[in-house]
Amino acid sequence: IPAGTAVQTDSATANYCVLQSLSGAKVLDRPSPVQLMKAMKTPAEQENFRAAHIKDGVAVCRFICWLQSHVGKEPITECSAAAKLESFRAQQPDYLGPSFDSIMAFGPHGAIVHYEPTAETDVPLEPRSFCLADTGGHYLQGTTDITRTIPLGPLTEEERRAYTVVLKG
């Protein structure tokens, strides 16, 4: 950037390389006006977000109920659980598809950041421990992203304590 050039940037969000490249410029350090405009939602946008989240919430609640009542009674794996959640979403009006690849992680897999079950890593769900579900959907009204830790059966004292601490914040 030529010396003396006026450049607007937000030092709170710009990366180091960008800030270093502005050393000779006249920097106007303030939030991006584009970000500020995008942050303001119209009443129609707010209503659509609400509608999308209600639809998604219905699908996720149905899935959790199904999962907790069927685990241990029929074969369910991480991959088949993700597919079942997708089928519950597909029953909702205006559903367009997943917003990202589902993370459905049983037991120790839940500790792997951005774990994604594959044919090689897929494991059966058992009526114990937790299933971590990080999923989302695209609806005509908006996009969702939801993460839930679902107990699948009796928990160890350590699991119960850790879960409680996380819920308390």
Regions found by a protein language model. Name each.
Residues I1-G169:
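Active-site neighborhoods and metal-handling regions in enzymes and metal-associated proteins
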